[in-house]
Structures are given as structure tokens and as C-alpha cells.
């Protein structure tokens, strides 16, 4: 149906990922590569808290991978919140931990919902050094925010991205890096995973469509919709 159509997503993808398999079934060539490289940041951990709240899969990975056995035992009794279903699924599949709260993926909606169940409690927010802190900034007046940097991200020194019909951006930083090197072609369409990334693209001067849901399924559906309409 969409033979010869090409899509690029700013995320490292596996052959079995839903985004890739769904679009390839209908003829798309799918390219995926993050424009960011990640590294762990050492941290001191105070576990006198009620909740852990994760913004991303990387936040989960760099937090849990640096814990010792004693710390892993202690956090079994802590409640866990995640910004969205993708992070919750990653947490369950890789660390056998169930999320007690799963957000919608959108910071404003997620903040309001989380505030209703965590008000007055202590919450650790493991994050990237360059994070926009989109959830915790909105919650500092209703709960005790414990900020914890567990990794840092920096632009890859060398990137070579093929020209495609559709560009899918999964973070503001990926968007900034891409458009520092490449210009938007008049024929290209742009999709953002959420409003934070969409607003960053607008600041750069790039019009975009925001996916209805910040998941692999939501992104794949956005690609199909934008291609059908074009």
C-alpha cells in the first residue's frame, strides 16, 4: 500500500518492535536511530521515600542498574509511578516491577493525576541531567520532590540519517540535534511523540503533528494517518 515510502524515527529500534513491524507490513521502509548517546551518573540514594517516579526507559535502566542488592531489597516496598505505558512495560519486562501509577505520557495530565494519589508524600524522580523536569516542577507545591540525576545524554558526534518522507521525533533534544544538521525538505512530514517535543519543533520553526498517544502504536497510527492524508 505504501511501497517506497520511508520513515525515520529518532529511536533505536529492534526488528520486533511494534512501530517497525506494523509499518513494514504495509510497505514502509523504517529507519531508526537515536541521535543521543547516554552514560551513567553516580548518585547517592536516600530511600526514605514513598514513591519512585520514572520519566523514561533510560531513567529506569540507569537507576536500577546502579543499585546494590540491599537497595534493591529496600525498594521492593516502594510504590512506583511512570510517565506512560511504555516505561511501565519496560520496567515490568526487565526488572519485574509493577507500576502503581501509569500516566498518559503527557506531562500536564500525568502531573494532575499523580498529584491526586501522591500529595503530601516523598517522591524520588530519577532523571537525565538535561531533563526538562516536566512532571516534578508542577508537583513541588503538593509533594516532596527528591531530584536524582542518574544519567546524562549528549549529542552523538557523528550522524548520517537517510532522507525519508516522514520524520518522527521522540524527544526535544533529538529534534534540536537533527535540525542543526539537516534542513526540512518541502515534501517531508513531521510527527512529534508529545506536546513537549511538538512545542520544541515549533520553536525551531518546524510544523508538526502530535501523535494522539505517546506509544509505539500511537506513533505508527500517526504515520499512517499523515501518509493517507498527504
Regions found by a protein language model. Give the residues of each.
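Conserved beta-alpha
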Residues: 1-230
Amino acid at each position: 500500500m505504501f511501497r517506497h515510502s520511508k520513515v525515520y524515527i529518532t529511536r533505536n529500534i529492534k526488528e520486533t518492535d511494534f512501530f517497525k513491524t506494523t509499518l513494514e507490513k504495509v510497505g514502509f521502509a523504517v529507519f531508526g536511530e537515536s541521535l543521543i548517546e547516554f552514560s551513567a551518573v553516580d548518585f547517592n540514594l536516600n530511600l526514605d521515600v514513598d514513591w519512585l517516579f520514572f520519566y523514561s526507559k533510560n531513567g529506569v535502566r540507569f537507576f536500577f542498574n546502579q543499585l546494590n542488592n540491599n537497595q534493591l531489597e529496600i525498594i521492593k516496598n516502594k510504590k512506583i509511578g511512570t510517565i506512560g505505558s511504555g516505561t511501565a512495560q519496560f520496567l515490568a519486562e526487565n526488572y519485574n516491577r509493577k507500576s502503581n501509577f501509569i500516566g498518559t505520557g503527557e506531562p500536564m495530565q500525568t502531573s494532575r493525576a499523580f498529584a491526586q494519589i501522591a500529595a503530601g508524600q516523598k517522591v524520588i524522580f530519577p532523571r537525565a541531567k538535561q531533563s526538562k523536569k516536566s512532571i516534578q516542577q508542577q508537583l513541588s507545591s503538593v509533594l516532596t520532590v527528591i531530584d536524582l540525576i542518574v544519567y546524562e545524554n549528549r549529542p552523538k558526534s557523528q550522524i548520517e540519517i537517510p532522507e525519508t518522507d516522514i520524520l518522527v521525533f521522540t524527544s526535544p533534544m533529538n529534534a534540536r540535534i537533527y535540525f542543526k544538521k539537516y534542513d526540512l525538505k518541502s515534501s517531508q512530514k513531521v510527527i512529534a511523540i508529545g506536546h513537549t517535543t511538538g512545542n520544541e519543533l515549533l520553536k525551531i520553526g518546524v510544523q508538526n503533528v502530535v501523535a494522539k498517544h505517546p506509544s509505539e502504536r500511537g506513533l505508527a497510527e500517526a504515520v499512517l494517518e499523515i501518509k493517507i492524508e498527504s
